[in-house]
Amino acid sequence: MKRACDFHVGDSFELVREADRYRPIYYAAVSGDFNPIHIDREVGRAAGFPDAILQGMCTMAWLADACTAYLEDPARVRRLRVRFSRPVVVGDVVTFRGRCVAVEGPVIRLEVEARNQRGEDVLKGASAEGWVEDLA
């Protein structure tokens, strides 16, 4: 597992996730968010979307997955900040691209962008803070 000295400003990482037909249903089952706009195509269309939309917290969980993969341990993720800018629609493919912007002792600061396959931002101002202690 990486130590704090192994993280460098400019490091980059990427994670790609697809919002398949079942993703909002699976997420509803574990979160309890059964709002029909997330699981019923016709409700999504009635709301002006081409299909059902993914729960925002599922998109945020994917952001956490991207940061966790880079930091190599979920316990290292200390803070996530995000603003939702566009719903993720069933069928969308979201690419999370992040980079390390600061290493200050044990604190690792990350900035992440998330875009769908049309190049549209689905998150704005996404950032994370990791804590990596070098225990001998």
Segments (PLM) and residue ranges:
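Hot-dog-fold acyl-thioester-processing enzymes
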Residues: 1-76
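HotDog/MaoC-like acyl-thioester-processing domains
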Residues: 1-12, 88-136
